[in-house]
């Protein structure tokens, strides 16, 4: 990638994208574009050039954003620090993501149709009986999914750069350029630490995860985060058969005081992990407890990889500043209670990119902060209720072992399972049957009353 002059005036006049970008963009412009309309106040870009956007981070959010930008006629550079990154992620994706993002089925390692919820006292409830034959939860490996989405973005015309984003300089005048500083990694030049380079863009999409440097630069504010710890375990074939279409979730103070432990199937191994917000120093103790709870089914297995990573607990206080915005984990789009983030990352990346394409009239006009705020407003309208409901569920049912027992008891109800899977698989809230809703409310209250009584009895025994 060509290093550009640090002189703002000169660089604005002589900005040159890498030849691979120019060639790629001509391919991208031949692809189908969104028909968009920019605001009348948006200034036209100088003749002969298009809107330039840097996407920082090459996970689901960054890959989806870069592809949509390139298809929409925007000159796009995606910067990813580690192209073979394996993230400690359960890897679950909803069924709607497969069709919505046109994912090939061979990307899905396992189709989970059975879920076992296991309470603190090891009471197990099987979930999945309400699923239709074609319905499943997809299990993917992040290193495979992320690489696929990046390659698709590259095919659409985006330039994928192996490098570490360092910081950005904000423009000194209206409609001026942002200067992106990064370390460019190239094994051929013999510089293991990378070569410092800069380039200019009109907008920046921060998709660089929970520890986002873009968020830090824009003053996005801090948030609570969980630490996720996961081991990939290669287990004997006869034990792997048990997990062919099954995943397990363990709840209890032993595996996590505020989250859950899991055993999720991958292509030829299982992922065993847990997470916590409140007791991060004890994460390895919780992981050992998760392994112990699953001992009978993973015994004889060999740990082939150990992973740890922060997971945001709620959206950041600020997600847009000028022509810089955040998507995915960088924005804090991970749901409480379930810890789901892949779909919301990809969805936010695409929605953000579509807002930029629309606001810039397919890359022919300067984008404005108001365009980016439209993406935020639409994302919040669609998904904010989901975040709030799961936040409440976590506070109610994860507060004690007695409450977790009540939670697992509720999961045995077919109506609960049907409503839960509908909302998860299709990311929609389907109106329920009023009579069933009343029954569910009564059962929930009953479960919580029993949980409270159980907690008091447990406290007496402890005393």
Curated annotation (Swiss-Prot):
GO molecular-function terms, A-Z: FAD binding; geranylgeranyl diphosphate reductase activity; geranylgeranyl reductase activity
Annotated GO biological process: chlorophyll biosynthetic process; photosynthesis; vitamin E biosynthetic process
Disulfide bonds: none
Residue range covered by the transit peptide: 1-37
Swiss-Prot/TrEMBL keywords: Chlorophyll biosynthesis, Chloroplast, NADP, Oxidoreductase, Photosynthesis, Plastid, Transit peptide
Protein localization: Plastid, Chloroplast
Pathway assignment: Porphyrin-containing compound metabolism; chlorophyll biosynthesis; Cofactor biosynthesis; tocopherol biosynthesis
Entry GO CC: chloroplast
Top-level taxon: Eukaryota
Reaction(s) this enzyme catalyzes, per UniProt: phytyl diphosphate + 3 NADP(+) = geranylgeranyl diphosphate + 3 NADPH + 3 H(+)
EC annotation from Swiss-Prot or TrEMBL: 1.3.1.83
UniProt record similarity statement: Belongs to the geranylgeranyl reductase family. ChlP subfamily.
Function: Catalyzes the reduction of geranylgeranyl diphosphate to phytyl diphosphate, providing phytol for both tocopherol and chlorophyll synthesis.
Protein name: Geranylgeranyl diphosphate reductase, chloroplastic
Organism in which the protein naturally occurs: Oryza sativa subsp. japonica (Rice)
Lineage of producing organism: Eukaryota, Viridiplantae, Streptophyta, Embryophyta, Tracheophyta
Gene: CHLP
């Amino acid at each position: 990638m060509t290093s550009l002059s640090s002189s703002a005036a000169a660089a604005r006049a002589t900005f040159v994208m890498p030849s691979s970008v120019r060639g790629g963009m001509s391919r991208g412009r031949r692809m189908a574009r969104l028909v968009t309309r920019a605001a009348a106040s948006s200034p036209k870009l100088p003749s002969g050039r298009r809107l330039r956007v840097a996407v920082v981070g090459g996970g689901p959010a960054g890959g989806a954003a870069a592809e949509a930008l390139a298809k929409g006629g925007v000159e796009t550079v995606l910067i990813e620090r580690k192209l073979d990154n394996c993230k400690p992620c359960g890897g679950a994706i909803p069924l709607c993501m497969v069709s919505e993002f046109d994912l090939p089925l061979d990307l899905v390692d396992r189709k989970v149709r059975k879920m076992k919820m296991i309470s603190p006292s090891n009471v197990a409830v099987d979930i999945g009986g309400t699923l239709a034959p074609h319905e499943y939860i997809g299990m993917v490996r992040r290193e495979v999914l992320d690489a696929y989405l990046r390659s698709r973005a590259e095919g659409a015309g985006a330039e994928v750069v192996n490098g570490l984003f360092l910081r950005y300089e904000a423009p000194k005048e209206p409609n001026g350029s942002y200067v992106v500083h990064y370390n460019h990694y190239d094994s051929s030049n013999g510089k293991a630490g990378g070569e410092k380079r800069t380039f200019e863009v009109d907008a920046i999409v921060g998709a660089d995860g929970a520890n986002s440097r873009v968020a830090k630069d824009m003053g996005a504010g801090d948030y609570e985060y969980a630490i996720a710890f996961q081991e990939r375990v290669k287990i004997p074939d006869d034990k792997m058969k048990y997990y062919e279409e099954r995943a397990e979730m363990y709840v209890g103070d032993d595996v996590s005081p505020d989250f859950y432990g899991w055993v999720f199937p991958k292509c030829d191994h299982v992922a065993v992990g847990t997470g916590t917000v409140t007791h991060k120093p004890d994460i390895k103790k919780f992981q050992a407890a998760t392994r112990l709870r699953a001992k009978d089914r993973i015994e004889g297995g060999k740990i082939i990889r150990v992973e740890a990573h922060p997971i945001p607990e709620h959206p950041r206080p600020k997600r847009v500043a000028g022509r810089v915005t955040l998507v995915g984990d960088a924005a804090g789009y991970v749901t409480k209670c379930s810890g789901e983030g892949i779909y919301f990352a990809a969805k936010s990346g695409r929605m953000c990119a579509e807002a930029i394409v629309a606001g810039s009239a397919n890359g022919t006009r300067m984008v404005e902060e108001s365009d980016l705020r439209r993406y935020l407003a639409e994302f919040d309208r669609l998904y904010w209720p989901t975040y709030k409901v799961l936040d409440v569920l976590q506070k109610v049912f994860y507060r004690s072992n007695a409450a977790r027992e009540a939670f697992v008891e509720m999961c045995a109800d077919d109506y609960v399972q049907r409503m839960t899977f509908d909302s998860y698989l299709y990311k929609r809230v389907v109106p329920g049957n009023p009579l069933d809703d009343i029954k569910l409310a009564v059962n929930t209250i009953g479960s919580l009353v029993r949980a409270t009584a159980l907690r008091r009895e447990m406290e007496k025994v402890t005393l």
